[in-house]
Regions:
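Short, well-structured N-terminal submotif of metal-dependent ribonuclease cores
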Residues: 1-50, 63-72, 130, 143-147
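Active-site neighborhoods of divalent-metal-dependent phosphate/nucleic-acid chemistry enzymes
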Residues: 2-4, 84-126
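Conserved glycosyltransferase catalytic-site signature
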Residues: 17, 52, 110-114
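Histidine/lysine/aspartate-rich catalytic loop segments that bind and position anionic ligands
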Residues: 54, 81
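An acidic/histidine-cluster motif and surrounding catalytic segment
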Residues: 77
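Short acidic-hydrophobic, aromatic-tinged amphipathic segments that line or gate anion-handling sites
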Residues: 86-89, 140-145
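Short loop/helix-cap segments at secondary-structure boundaries that form the rim of catalytic
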Residues: 130-138
């Protein structure tokens, strides 16, 4: 999938946890694709959304291994990056995530991410979770499929 075509007409983009991990930790597997997504969203002034649970998912491993520098790097990234908003889990998001879990058999974190994307009006969802492609209410963009 060509990124510029996949994001054509997208004004609100949701980014799942894994792209933030690849980017912040400079993980080579999908770093080029993630950098391209961030560059595209910044150049095209696309509102980018993620959930507050993203920070929790990102810092769990660094906390486990006492990597306070990496924890701080994540916190700085989410506080200072332009055009990226963190959305709290509301009652509506929680209820919608339950519907998604019931309909698609999603794990709770995945359902919360997708529910947040839907409730905030996102047209596309960037992830590396191939299993999420079964969700039909939203355009699911897989990092591993981007060129």
């Amino acid at each position: 999938m060509i990124l510029s075509q996949a994001l054509l007409g997208v004004h609100h983009l949701y980014i799942d946890t894994s792209p933030f991990i690849y980017y912040t930790e400079n993980r080579p597997e999908f770093l080029a694709q993630v950098k391209a997504v961030f560059a595209y969203q910044e150049i095209n002034n696309i509102d980018t959304i993620t959930s507050v649970i993203t920070l929790s998912e990102c810092v769990t491993k660094p906390l486990k291994v006492n990597d306070s520098l990496l924890v701080s790097a994540y916190e700085r990234f989410f506080l200072k990056t332009r055009n990226i908003s963190m959305t709290p889990v509301t009652l509506q998001i929680s209820r919608r995530s339950a519907d998604l879990r019931a309909n698609y058999g999603l794990r709770t974190p995945d359902a919360l991410h997708i529910a947040t994307a839907l409730e905030t009006g996102c047209e596309a969802f960037v992830t590396n979770g191939v299993s999420l492609k079964r969700v039909k209410e939203l355009s699911i963009l897989i990092l591993g499929e981007m060129i």
